[in-house]
């Protein structure tokens, strides 16, 4: 099979991360989600904790200056490209570096935009019914429904703002992706199988052309 890159965007509680991991296993490649934070930290010289605090958020420096810069590594502060755009570039470079090394699945972090000029890229967006998403967050976070709904609203607002700002596109809008699918209809397992078959068919079309 030819080299392939799969980008998975997802609503919170949709099972997107689980599906991405299953796709990676299906296609024999590595799945990058929070692992990208470690790669970006290595690229930048900043601590991984700094990237964790600002993951998929447009306002990178809010937590930074409110907490008196505890997340910098030992590298000289002024020798790093210390700006919001600079930090985004470190993460983008980490995504490109991973993509150059072989087949991979990326979860979120505007990977679809970062890799827009790469060949054999498939962009997927996974949604789910709000009730299913609330249940998933309740279980994962051990919180009640009201708190879960608030968690979803707050984090998706941040995620959309981050995506829209850096890509000039709209997070979750169908025109940004090759396939959008609601995991509530088929469940996690069957949704992954459906996506995998779509990817195989799409890859065949790319090869034949």
Which residues make up each language-model segment?
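Extreme N-terminal starter segment of soluble prokaryotic enzymes
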Residues: 2-5
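RNA pseudouridine synthases
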Residues: 98, 111-117
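NTP-dependent small-molecule kinase module
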Residues: 92-96, 165-209
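Conserved phosphate-donor/acceptor-positioning beta-strand/loop module used by diverse small-molecule
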Residues: 117-140, 145-153
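Short beta-strand-centered segment that lines the nucleotide-binding/catalytic pocket of NTP-utilizing
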Residues: 30-41
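Glycine-rich phosphate-binding P-loop
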Residues: 8-21
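Small-molecule kinase domains that catalyze NTP-dependent phosphoryl transfer to phosphate-bearing small molecules
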Residues: 61-70, 144-188
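ATP-dependent small-molecule kinase phosphotransfer cores
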Residues: 41-103
């Amino acid at each position: 099979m030819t080299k392939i890159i799969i980008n998975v965007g997802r609503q919170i509680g949709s099972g997107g991360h689980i599906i991405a991991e299953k796709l990676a296993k299906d296609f024999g490649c590595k799945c990058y989600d929070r692992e990208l934070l470690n790669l970006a930290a290595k690229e930048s010289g900043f601590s991984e904790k700094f990237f964790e605090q600002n993951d998929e958020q447009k306002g990178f420096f809010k937590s930074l200056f409110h907490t008196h810069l505890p997340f910098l590594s030992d590298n000289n502060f002024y020798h790093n490209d210390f700006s919001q755009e600079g930090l985004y570039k470190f993460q983008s470079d980490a995504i490109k570096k991973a993509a150059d090394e072989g087949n991979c699945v990326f979860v979120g972090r505007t990977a679809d935009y970062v890799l827009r000029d790469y060949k054999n890229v498939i962009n997927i967006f996974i949604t789910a019914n709000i009730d299913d998403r609330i249940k998933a967050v309740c279980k994962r976070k051990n919180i009640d429904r009201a708190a879960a709904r608030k968690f979803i609203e707050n984090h998706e607002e941040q995620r959309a703002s981050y995506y829209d700002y850096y890509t000039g596109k709209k997070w979750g809008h169908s025109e940004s992706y090759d396939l959008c699918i609601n995991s509530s209809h088929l469940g996690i397992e069957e949704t992954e199988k459906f996506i995998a078959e779509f990817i195989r068919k799409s890859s065949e079309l790319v090869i034949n052309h």
